[in-house]
């Protein structure tokens, strides 16, 4: 395992924001390298899951949107009318704005600098769908973030969360951990041109993040129903899908 020590909870948000700002320009290439381009497949699957559950005209909140990789896929979907992109890294959000400039000019995309645990700029029941890609484990208060997601979703709306998972098979887990904790940081150093603690943080942050079943229980505790998940690459990555209950008639 890496010798990197996670920042204390009250310093985590500042650490994450500062360091994502630093690596923003290299982040997409880093994802390509460390996932062998598979992150693109997983993100496409997230969008297809939305399309399989709705008829169209969707207003989507892409939370922790980063450089807009999922936002772009959502905007390209004929099922989506509007995407609101939120991140608390200014530099990440600037890249998303550049990437989606034409779509924003058409009024199909909107950008907000914001914190996933304090979505005060949004009304209750405002969005049909909320998506997060590899961002939930970076928040400093998981329960608060999920509570906010639940609040801004319309009744019957859907939350989709793509992030790291836990591999159950011990032999595969050993290989996965070796790659994630030893090789992935080195790939980051090569890309960065030197050592950078953010590339150590990314794998270490997975240690305190809930496994598939635990996150499912947390989502249900916060009020979500029909919570399911799909594993990719033996559970190294997982997509959770959860529904907010419809209003009683």
UniProtKB/Swiss-Prot annotation:
The keyword rRNA processing does not apply. It comes from Leptospira interrogans serogroup Icterohaemorrhagiae serovar Lai (strain 56601). Belongs to the class I-like SAM-binding methyltransferase superfamily. MenG/UbiE family. This is Demethylmenaquinone methyltransferase. It is an enzyme of class 2 (transferase). The keyword Transferase applies. Pathway: Quinol/quinone metabolism; menaquinone biosynthesis; menaquinol from 1,4-dihydroxy-2-naphthoate: step 2/2. The lineage of its organism: Bacteria, Pseudomonadati, Spirochaetota, Spirochaetia, Leptospirales. It comes from the Bacteria. PANTHER family: 2-METHOXY-6-POLYPRENYL-1,4-BENZOQUINOL METHYLASE, MITOCHONDRIAL, METHYLTRANSFERASE. InterPro entries: SAM-dependent_MTases_sf, UbiE/COQ5_MeTrFase, UbiE/COQ5_MeTrFase_CS. Methyltransferase required for the conversion of demethylmenaquinol (DMKH2) to menaquinol (MKH2). Gene3D superfamilies: Vaccinia Virus protein VP39. It catalyses: a 2-demethylmenaquinol + S-adenosyl-L-methionine = a menaquinol + S-adenosyl-L-homocysteine + H(+). Its EC number is 2.1.1.163. S-adenosyl-L-methionine binds at residues 67, 87, 115-116.
């Amino acid at each position: 395992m890496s010798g990197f020590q996670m920042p204390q909870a009250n310093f985590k948000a500042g650490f994450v924001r500062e360091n994502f700002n630093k690596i923003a320009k290299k982040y997409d290439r880093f994802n390509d390298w460390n996932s062998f381009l598979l992150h693109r497949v997983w993100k496409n699957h997230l969008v297809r899951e939305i399309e399989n559950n709705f008829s169209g005209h969707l207003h989507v909140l892409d939370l922790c949107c980063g450089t807009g990789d999922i936002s772009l896929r959502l905007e390209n979907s004929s099922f989506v009318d509007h995407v609101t992109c939120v991140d608390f890294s200014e530099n990440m959000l600037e890249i998303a704005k550049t990437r989606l400039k034409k779509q924003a000019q058409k009024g199909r995309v909107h950008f907000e600098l914001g914190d996933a645990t304090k979505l005060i700029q949004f009304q209750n029941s405002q969005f049909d769908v909320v998506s997060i890609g590899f961002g939930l484990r970076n928040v400093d208060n998981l329960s608060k973030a999920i509570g906010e997601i639940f609040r801004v979703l319309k009744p019957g709306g859907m939350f989709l969360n793509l992030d790291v998972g836990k591999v159950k098979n011990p032999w595969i887990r050993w290989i996965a951990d070796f790659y994630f904790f030893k090789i992935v940081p080195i790939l980051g150093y090569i890309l960065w041109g030197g050592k950078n603690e953010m590339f150590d943080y990314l794998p270490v942050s997975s240690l305190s993040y809930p496994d598939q079943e635990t996150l499912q229980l947390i989502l249900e505790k916060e009020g979500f129903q029909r919570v399911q998940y799909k594993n990719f690459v033996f559970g190294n990555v997982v997509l959770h899908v959860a529904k907010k209950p419809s209003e009683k008639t």
